[in-house]
């Protein structure tokens, strides 16, 4: 089904560049099952569960001339083996070697001509462990209730639920002309929404002179701060390149729960 990206999802999609990829990475380190976990078994598991996240078989199609936000369309050339990949460390691989591998994988941008996600099965990790690393674009999983592929393949019980056989038939590509006509129709029916879609959201938010003055004041304050160069000294205050480093910080889940209860918020709000 052809659906238009929301304003926030379209923003994540458009803001991406090689130095600032807009995806979310998830690393799972697991004990290897007694029966093992082959690449073929992982492929089968992912294929079984894709119906729960149908967006993962869709790609983004931009509208010519930028008349409207991009749309999600079925990827008629969807290839599960492109998205689910296999890698290995020189056995027995250490955690440091795993972190170096993840840093290299994290530096690679997602291919915008395909569904915006990847999964890597990493073998050879010491202490009889394996790792799963997934990359999912923010446009795919934006929102608290959205599901990512890494969550869908993880079961809460030892015995996974039964999944009905999935026979997926991709829809026909809508084509450039149809998308343009649909965009023109949206302009006629909802001109305000389309203005917001092409970059006039700020004008829509400023509804009176008081808001305009306040917005201008904030912009000037930010400009003065930048001009004075008052950012604190930190290794993070540097030009961002496409290269990445991966490191680990350990924290107690009980501490997260305490903060969440104290301030009545979810963990993602303050992390």
Swiss-Prot record:
| Keywords attached to this entry | Acyltransferase, Glycerol metabolism, Lipid biosynthesis, Lipid metabolism, Transferase
User: What reactions does this protein catalyze?
Assistant: an acyl-CoA + a 1,2-diacyl-sn-glycerol = a triacyl-sn-glycerol + CoA; di-(9Z)-octadecenoylglycerol + (9Z)-octadecenoyl-CoA = 1,2,3-tri-(9Z-octadecenoyl)-glycerol + CoA
Using the UniProt record, name the top-level EC class of this enzyme in a single word.
Answer: transferase
Give the pathway listed in the UniProt entry for this protein.
Glycerolipid metabolism; triacylglycerol biosynthesis
pH-related activity note: Optimum pH is 6.5.
EC number(s) reported in the record: 2.3.1.20
Q: Name one Pfam family in it.
A: WS_DGAT_cat
* Record's GO cellular component terms: plasma membrane
GO MF annotation, one: diacylglycerol O-acyltransferase activity
InterPro entries, sorted: O-acyltransferase_WSD1-like, O-acyltransferase_WSD1_N
* GO terms for biological process, alphabetical: biological process involved in interaction with host; glycerol metabolic process; glycerolipid biosynthetic process; response to hypoxia; response to nitric oxide; triglyceride biosynthetic process
User: Its function?
Assistant: Catalyzes the terminal and only committed step in triacylglycerol synthesis by using diacylglycerol and fatty acyl CoA as substrates. Required for storage lipid synthesis. Upon expression in E.coli functions as a triacylglycerol synthase, making triacylglycerol (TG) from diolein and long-chain fatty acyl-CoA. Has no wax synthase activity to produce wax esters.
Family of this protein: Belongs to the long-chain O-acyltransferase family.
Q: Which PANTHER family match?
A: O-ACYLTRANSFERASE (WSD1-LIKE) FAMILY PROTEIN, WAX ESTER SYNTHASE_DIACYLGLYCEROL ACYLTRANSFERASE 4-RELATED
Q: What is this protein called?
A: Probable diacyglycerol O-acyltransferase tgs3
Q: Which species is this record about? A: Mycobacterium tuberculosis (strain ATCC 25618 / H37Rv)
